[in-house]
Regions:
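Conserved GTPase G-domain substructure that encodes guanine base recognition and part of the catalytic core
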Residues: 1-292
């Protein structure tokens, strides 16, 4: 895509200083979609490979196009996002963010990942010269507004919500210095979610991240309510045998004692399932499936 971001687009960037580190940081930036007025279709860029998905009409069950776009963005991005960052002064203060989070909370579970890996939310405000408030009181006000908008528990979709006020703009303070605290907060939040993913064995390599993201894109285009199942997606090219249950029952019928069950049957079944989930060519098959 061009450097100019059209309304409704989300552009993916890599944080340049982290590009060749062991901890590369990806940033997806965009505006809050407002698609109630039809716009012309985007023109494909010649320098980028483009692919499209036709939405199933059942995915557009919300009253407006904007709400439908919100639904799609959240269900697609949430399983792959560490932190959602909103700049309150750019979108009209707290109310638009409250409405958006309330909509997201009402959408239900976006994926089968553990709750501890859910993304965090950071709301950024700008201090004026006469700033007299504090982040804690502003956060309480925000959470009160959110509780009035929805009865859903925030922890259903997000692992935390925080608020950060940036220093007032001054001639002797560079933009880099103003935003240093923001970057530190984002990195700290991301590290916390990353640790949760490590602890639950759901931190994926870049190759698998890309493959799962493409699978999630097709899933979101095809269904409106079912959460994206990472395990099912990983088995697309190696589906579970339909008669697996029968084989397990027959095998266990031959186990006559608790000792045989613990010392023989359970280890054999466990190792067989693990080996079946990781055939020699599964990585290549998953990448080929994504390309197709």
């Amino acid at each position: 895509m061009t450097g100019r971001r059209a309304h409704g687009e989300i552009h993916l960037h890599i944080h340049a200083p982290s590009a060749f580190s062991s901890r590369p940081i990806l940033l997806a930036e965009g505006d809050l979609p407002n698609l109630d007025k039809p716009r012309r279709a985007l023109v494909a860029e010649k320098c980028h490979e483009a692919s499209s998905r036709q939405l199933d009409s059942r995915t557009l069950t919300t009253p407006t196009l904007s709400a439908s776009a919100d639904k799609i963005y959240f269900r697609l991005l949430s399983p792959f996002t560490d932190v959602f960052c909103f700049f309150a002064d750019d979108v009209g203060k707290f109310r638009p963010i409250v409405e958006r989070l309330a909509l997201w909370l009402d959408l239900g579970q976006p994926s089968t990942l553990p709750r501890s890996t859910r993304p965090k939310v950071l709301i950024v405000t700008e201090r004026g010269e006469d700033f007299a408030g504090d982040d804690e009181s502003d956060l309480r006000d925000f959470k009160r507004m959110l509780s009035e908008e929805t009865t859903m528990d925030v922890s259903e979709q997000f692992s935390d919500i925080r608020l950060l006020s940036l220093a007032a703009r001054k001639k002797d303070l560079s933009n880099r210095a103003r935003h240093r605290e923001l970057f530190e907060h984002l990195l700290n939040f991301s590290d916390q979610v990353r640790e949760a993913r490590v602890n639950t064995q759901t931190l994926f390599s870049a190759h698998y991240f890309t493959a799962f993201f493409h699978c999630a894109l097709s899933h979101v285009a095809a269904t409106s309510v079912e959460p994206f199942n990472f395990i099912a997606a990983s088995r697309i090219e190696n589906p579970v045998a339909s008669n697996l249950g029968g084989h397990l029952v027959d095998f266990l019928h031959n186990i006559k004692t608790p000792e045989k069950l613990l010392e023989f049957a359970i280890p054999v079944i466990t190792s067989s399932l693990l080996l079946d989930s990781h055939p020699l060519d599964i990585y290549c098959k998953l990448i080929v499936a994504v390309k197709h």
